[in-house]
Amino acid sequence: MNLAEICDNAKKGREYALLGNYDSSMVYYQGVMQQIQRHCQSVRDPAIKGKWQQVRQELLEEYEQVKSIVSTLESFKIDKPPDFPVSCQDEPFRDPAVWPPPVPAEHRAPPQIRRPNREVRPLRKEMAGVGARGPVGRAHPISKSEKPSTSRDKDYRARGRDDKGRKNMQDGASDGEMPKFDGAGYDKDLVEALERDIVSRNPSIHWDDIADLEEAKKLLREAVVLPMWMPDFFKGIRRPWKGVLMVGPPGTGKTMLAKAVATECGTTFFNVSSSTLTSKYRGESEKLVRLLFEMARFYAPTTIFIDEIDSICSRRGTSDEHEASRRVKSELLIQMDGVGGALENDDPSKMVMVLAATNFPWDIDEALRRRLEKRIYIPLPTAKGRAELLKINLREVELDPDIQLEDIAEKIEGYSGADITNVCRDASLMAMRRRINGLSPEEIRALSKEELQMPVTKGDFELALKKIAKSVSAADLEKYEKWMVEFGSA
């Protein structure tokens, strides 16, 4: 007799009982008790035989408990006579593996749309522009004989009244309230996600917060800001640019420039990335692109900033391109052309400007490159720009009187704006690191604020420069300059 098999069967019986599989558990309990009984017949030692009998008795008690649980569960399944007779027609047989048919909904008119109510008249007047195409709502209850309208009909009617409904909402909105986007025809969750995660009104970034980049600021003012200030001038051949592409190494301030543009223009700022316009459901990504541009037109004047646009609209026709990615690119290109077409017949002050930034301009699709008419280069900061950036980053930090920011600016040549910010942050922490060196956690907590507010010295910057190297190589800069010579449009 294999003792390991007895132990394994007893273990499985207990595990099945714990998992609720009582039928299998009872089978294993019965088998292991028979095995123990046969094993006891072959044992000659009375002491060992008594122990096996004790084990069999314990397993028998467990078996009786499982059997009691099964009988209790079976008692719940006993059919009790109903209080009232039920015919076979009332309760037809239902296959548990098949979903039951939906319960028919009773269509009733909401109580707030009754004729005596005078408060809903402004809403009905607001929708009067849609009444020429057909009835949108019903004032009387829908009878059961009438066929309810399908979701496809509602979608067509909603899309047909999108532009008029939104224009009426903009005209009827009070001065103190921000008009709300009417997402009729779209999933409510998609609209709320874009409103919550993308829309950023009046970012508090100004031109003075950005060091250097005077040429880029001048070009952005001409391409984006001036059409807002002089709408009568920018008409016809002087129409505003459809899009602006900012090209440059990482950390040079492209996102900061986009936020400054939105602040100076007083526009609604949409910050879009590849995750924003991506959905696992077929066709949802294209709807998100279209919804984004419709919301941008509604909240116009609007700045749509697409960061890392090469991840959304890379070159088409490659072997590793997916069908869904191609559809998203096509919808984005169509909507960008649609923005320009809408501006020609609309108020120039209601423009939608597309700002894009990329670190890989050579991967962008040719059609998108054509739509982004202004392509400007955001270079590394100059010596003057590095000194200004040091002043901006260290304006809240106490500096040693002997420190010369111009000397430090010469040492960080080739550093990007993000690299310089990291150097300033690391240097400002050096004094704190020296102060808490060797102290226990209790002593660190007991330190006063004045003890930690020590000035930053030149030696702190030297230590920080030894630890932090520049992140942009000369070969990368040469690639950007070569691309700008071939495709730049500054």
UniProtKB/Swiss-Prot annotation:
Residues 128-139 have a biased composition (Low complexity). Coiled coil: none annotated. Its main location: cytoplasm. SMART domains: AAA (SM00382). Residues 116-127, 143-169 have a biased composition (Basic and acidic residues). The modification Phosphoserine is found at S174. Disulfide bonds: none annotated. Expressed in testis, restricted to Sertoli cells (at protein level). Residues 95-184 are annotated as: Disordered. It is found in: Cytoplasm, Cytoskeleton; Cytoplasm; Cytoplasm, Cytoskeleton, Spindle pole; Cytoplasm, Cytoskeleton, Spindle. PROSITE patterns: AAA. It catalyses: n ATP + n H2O + a microtubule = n ADP + n phosphate + (n+1) alpha/beta tubulin heterodimers. Interacts with KATNB1 and KATNBL1. Belongs to the AAA ATPase family. Katanin p60 subunit A1 subfamily. A-like 1 sub-subfamily. This is Katanin p60 ATPase-containing subunit A-like 1.
